From Swiss-Prot:
Protein family: Belongs to the cullin family.
Gene3D superfamilies: Cullin Repeats, Cullin, Chain C, Domain 2, Winged helix-like DNA-binding domain superfamily/Winged helix DNA-binding domain
SMART domains from the UniProt entry: CULLIN (SM00182), Cullin_Nedd8 (SM00884)
Comment, domains: The Cullin neddylation domain restrains the RING domain of RBX1 in the E3 ubiquitin-protein ligase complex; this restraint is removed upon neddylation of the cullin.
Chain's gene name: Cul2
GO molecular function: protein-containing complex binding; ubiquitin ligase complex scaffold activity; ubiquitin protein ligase binding
Protein name per Swiss-Prot or TrEMBL: Cullin-2
Origin species: Mus musculus (Mouse)
Cullin neddylation domain: residues covered: 675-735
Modified residues (Phosphothreonine): 661
Length: 745
């Protein structure tokens, strides 16, 4: 074919073209040669001489399409009950034919229509150069537009009514023609799919809106029927079944954009409209832990707004009640272990339930945390919360040498699990005080099962609460290794003296930082060191002063222990004793009988401490009370028990020093209160320094927020701290408002 423009007879060329496009649009056979000739004819018309005939070709093609669609419309109308089937048949034929026509008219589309086509801006803001009423469209688009205007819109009511009826029959169990229904609905999408903006607007307006209304009505009635014939479990099962069926139905018939809208409408009618009924059954389902019902209820309630909160609240109450039942009435002897293991058991049970039944939903995990927080921090009216102390004792039991039958790995696993419970404590500072006191006893008295386990536990607490929380614990741990090094240096110091020095005893010492250890430096009694120990103490003080100038050593004799060999019996016994007990026993080196007054003079101990020490030796029958009176007084005298015997050749004499006393517990809690006051005062100063001016309520909220990681401060305590800082002139009340504070620089 020649590409050169030439004179063309439009009527003759159009008649040939018309015959071909009639065949094309009806999917009749067209020979390849004919197709090529018609393609050339369209080109010739578009480049015709003296003037192109593209505009006339477009107009005639449009007239043909209008005529053809009107003809098909009449035939569909005449089919009566077969409207959907006939519509679908003609649509399938017409839409494919329109695609072929669009290919045939490719040159017209690209060279004439696209060049003269209005842009979206032209349509929106107006453009005088082209007739605004009839914007040009590519031939494929024009064909679809004709179908929409001349077929779909006139048949709209009939088509929609029939489609809704067929889908309703499908819901009722009948088996309608899926291909026809899907094809008809898809035609509503296809006729405007070429549009760049809102291509689904026509489909949504003509079909989706009435379909959603019909769906809502249908499932409203369906829910009403189901409620009359079912209990809650059955209702949930059936509703889930209906939702699944409707989802399959959506995929069979509708455009993907409609799936969620339809399912949402079903959920509104069958779930949201009956929330009160579902919520009323929620309590018994959770109380009885009916897992299948819980899973079904979760799936249903999750899908509607304000559906889940009630279920979350019910589960939280249930976990709280079960937790309290598990942790109450525990035997006193094993309370720390039973308490922690009971909480872990409840935690493990409900974590598994939430993961397997409730899809691991974080809202329920948060409810679990809140419930167990209230369980762990529960306290009887007018009593303190026992959890911090119990948890500290639990760790103490695990980390002591007396934790029999457990390997280090088993202890490690238990301590890792323990952190789960620890995180629920509000008063972490109370735990820290008890833990530090128990750690001190383990370290000083050599009771730790393993120093590696001690360090691992401190690191776990550090990960949970930060460096500041464990800084003192770290220093205590470090002091032990530093002391071991110090002992080696001291032994070298003794060996390297010019004159040979015999201390007379093997001697080990711990040098502890006063600020890190929870130890009272004020002894409960005065004390004179036994002569046998004096030399070693003096030499260590000399060594220490030479190595660390400016440091002051304070001897904590009440914490010291030693071993005493008993050479006066048939068996070679060794007694592990406190320094106070040692001082009393060493008095018997010079005499088998010693009076109370002599002991008082030699030890310089006060009456209370001396009496307690003597009593501990009487209890194990190492000495005898040479008096008919039971009570110890100034006239008492004591003698060595020469017939003493024990199953063990090495034994320990326990004292109240190693046991927890009510006074110690009270001291610990008092120390916590003092620390809290200082912490709150520091927090208030920090906040006010940054903010300069702050209202009362805002300051209190800031302080609570900053303190929550360590403890939950009471508002009354915060107020007292504010008053203290006003007295100390760190802050002042604002002159403008009594409800406002200013930072004093």
């Amino acid at each position: 074919m020649s590409l050169k423009p030439r004179v063309v007879d439009f009527d003759e060329t159009w008649n040939k073209l018309l015959t071909t496009i009639k065949a094309v649009v009806m999917l009749e056979y067209v020979e390849r040669a004919t197709w090529n000739d018609r393609f050339s004819d369209i080109y010739a018309l578009c480049v015709a001489y003296p003037e192109p005939l593209g505009e006339r070709l477009y107009a005639e093609t449009k007239i043909f399409l209008e005529s053809h669609v009107r003809h098909l419309y009449k035939r569909v109308l005449e089919s009566e009950e077969q409207v959907l089937v006939m519509y679908h048949r003609y649509w399938e034929e017409y839409s494919k034919g329109a695609d072929y026509m669009d290919c045939l008219y490719r040159y017209l589309n690209t060279q004439y229509i696209k060049k003269n086509k209005l842009t979206e801006a032209d349509i929106q803001y107006g453009y005088g150069g082209v007739d605004m009423n009839e914007p040009l469209m590519e031939i494929g688009e024009l064909a679809l537009d004709m179908w929409r205007k001349l077929m779909v819109e006139p048949l709209q009511n009939i088509l929609i009514r029939m489609l809704l009826r067929e889908i309703k029959n499908d819901r009722g169990g009948e088996d309608p023609n899926q291909k026809v229904i899907h094809g008809v609905i898809n035609s509503f999408v296809h006729v405007e799919q070429y549009k760049k903006k809102f291509p689904l607007k026509f489909y949504q307006g003509i079909f989706v809106s009435p379909f959603l209304t019909e769906t809502g009505e249908y499932y409203k009635q369906e829910a009403s029927n189901l409620l009359q014939e079912s209990n809650c479990s059955q209702y949930m099962e059936k509703v889930l079944g209906r939702l699944k069926d409707e989802e399959i139905r959506c995929r069979k018939y509708l455009h993907p954009s409609s799936y969620t809208k339809v399912i949402h409408e079903c959920q509104q009618r069958m779930v949201a409209d009956h929330l009160q009924f579902l919520h009323s059954e929620c309590h018994s389902i959770i109380q009885q832990e009916r897992k299948n019902d819980m899973a079904n209820m979760y799936v249903l309630l999750r899908a509607v707004s304000s559906g889940l909160p009630h279920m979350i609240e019910e589960l939280q109450k249930h976990i709280h009640d079960e937790g309290l039942r598990a942790t109450s009435n525990l035997t006193q002897e094993h309370m720390p272990t039973l308490f922690v293991e009971s909480v872990l058991e409840v935690h493990g049970k409900f974590v598994q339930l939430i993961n397997t039944v409730l899809n691991g939903d974080q809202h329920f995990m948060s409810a679990l945390d809140k419930a167990l927080t209230s369980v762990v921090n529960y306290r009887e009216p007018k009593s303190v919360c026992k959890a911090p102390e119990l948890l500290a004792k639990y760790c103490d039991n695990l980390l002591k040498k007396s934790a029999k039958g457990m390997t280090e790995n088993e202890v490690e696993d238990k301590l890792t699990s323990f952190i789960t419970v620890f995180k629920y404590i509000d008063d972490k500072d109370v735990f820290q005080k008890f833990y530090a006191r128990m750690l001190a006893k383990r370290l000083i008295h050599g009771l730790s099962m393993s120093m590696d386990s001690e360090e691992a536990m401190i690191n776990k607490l550090k990960q949970a609460c930060g460096y500041e929380f464990t800084s003192k614990l770290h220093r205590m741990y470090t002091d032990m290794s530093v002391s071991a090094d110090l002992n080696n240096k001291f032994n070298n110091f003794i060996r390297n003296q010019d004159t040979v020095i015999d201390l007379g005893i093997s001697f080990q010492i711990y040098v502890l930082q006063a600020g890190a250890w929870p130890l009272t430096q004020a002894p409960s009694s005065t004390f004179a060191i036994p002569q046998e120990l004096e030399k070693s103490v003096q030499m260590f003080e000399l060594f220490y002063s030479q190595h660390f100038s400016g440091r002051k050593l304070t001897w904590l004799h009440y914490l010291c222990t030693g071993e005493v060999k008993m050479n006066y019996l048939g068996k070679p016994y060794v007694a592990m004793v406190t320094t106070y007990q040692m001082a009393v026993l060493l008095a018997f080196n010079n005499s088998e009988t010693v009076s109370y007054k002599e002991l008082q003079d030699s030890t310089q101990m006060n009456e209370k401490e001396l009496t307690k020490t003597i009593k501990s030796l009487l209890d194990v029958k190492m000495i005898n009370h040479d008096s008919e009176k039971e009570d110890i007084d100034a006239e008492s005298s004591f003698s060595l028990n020469m017939s003493f015997s024990s199953k063990r050749t090495k034994f320990k004499i326990t004292t109240s020093m190693q046991k927890d006393t009510p006074q110690e517990l009270e001291q610990t809690r008092s120390a916590v209160d003092e620390d809290r006051k200082m912490y709150l005062q520091a927090a208030i100063v920090r906040i006010m320094k940054a903010r300069k001016v702050l209202r009362h309520n805002a300051l209190i909220q800031e302080v609570i927020s900053q303190s929550r990681a360590r403890f939950n401060p009471s508002i009354s305590m915060i107020k007292k701290c504010i008053e203290v800082l006003i007295d100390k002139q760190y802050i002042e009340r604002s002159q403008a408002s009594a409800d406002e504070y200013s930072y004093v620089a």
